[in-house]
Amino acid sequence: RMAMRIVYVNESLAKQKAEEAVNSEIGVMTVSTDGAYHKVVDHNPWERFMPNWGDARISADLVCYMNGYSDPRREVYYDKSTFATKGAYKGTEDYVGLRRGIRQGQYNSWSQGYSCMKVTVSDNMLIFPASEVTFLRAEGALRGWNMGGTAKALYEEAVSLSFDER
């Protein structure tokens, strides 16, 4: 991650550090179980406020993008909207995000219909996923760096990994 953050300031150092990380004896995260998680002791806070408090929902920006591409990760990441079953918006997508910046008073009565993140009480909280590392490796490979695979193969691997992470 650090290498991609400095690539526009010092590309040669970025390349050096990325290649050192990928090719070191320890290596980098490559499978979803390698991801950095915060262990939940009592109750996952996302589960507490996302579906129950009514004031936090999935962003419409992200959901519209994913709907537009029929992104199959939607069913892994989100619960379906209940608007269609309530008859609120006939013909809407199964996944409906809440528009950013809307005033709380404007959506209180409808907030329960928007899609929520799929999360349970005991889910650990993902901090740094292996899929992100693999996407970064794909970006490095696209720049011609030695990332242990082609940009295409690493990108596809990252997408695949992202299905196991949430």
Language model features: what each stretch is:
Residues 4-12, 145-147:
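Short coil/turn linking the two alpha-helices of tandem helical-hairpin repeats
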Residues 15-137, 142-143, 148-166:
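Hydrophobic-face positions in mid-chain alpha helices that act as interaction patches
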